Amino acid sequence: MASKWNWSGTKGRRTPRRPYGRPYKSSVPTTRVVVHQSAVLKKDEVVGTEIKPEGDVARYKMKKVMLTCTLRMAPGELVNYLIVKCNSPISSWSAAFTSPALLVKESCQDMITIIAKGKVESNGVAGTDCTKSFNRFIKLGAGITQTQHLYVVLYTSVALKAVLEHRVYVEV
């Protein structure tokens, strides 16, 4: 016979549809942390930044991330991006990723996991800059703890200004 107690030790509510309460795991409270960054990216260069909560958070687990990036670039240009998870910090972006396609190099394949990828192509009238953006909502499954690292990696075909904002849903 199934137990009428949940994992926290309290009895669940009885209803006509469910006369005996099922055990359920109590939800951990989450907080939302918003981080705003801006950078000027160089032409044909692979760059990246870490996605993590700022402040005095010593122990945490990230479950979800909402990523927004706004780019100002000339028409006909391309931006590739990757969101990757890694167990150790990445010191050299060009040593870990190939240049135009952002593929993980063979020497780093055992420590880098690709979570999401995409591209942004600009269109418009020649001679004027256009603003493009992308939004990604990333569910991280079991979560990423403070000992792991989450990065967004960008490759641009032209020098441009990027504004990166991310909202991190953290279990503390």
From Swiss-Prot:
Biased composition (Basic residues): 11-20
Presence of keyword RNA-binding: no
Localization, UniProt: Virion
Keywords in alphabetical order: Capsid protein, T=1 icosahedral capsid protein, Virion
Region span, Disordered: 1-26
GO cellular component, one term: T=1 icosahedral viral capsid
Sections of the chain in a coiled coil: none
Entry's family note: Belongs to the nanoviridae capsid protein family.
Protein name: Capsid protein
Originating species: Faba bean necrotic yellows virus (isolate Egyptian EV1-93)
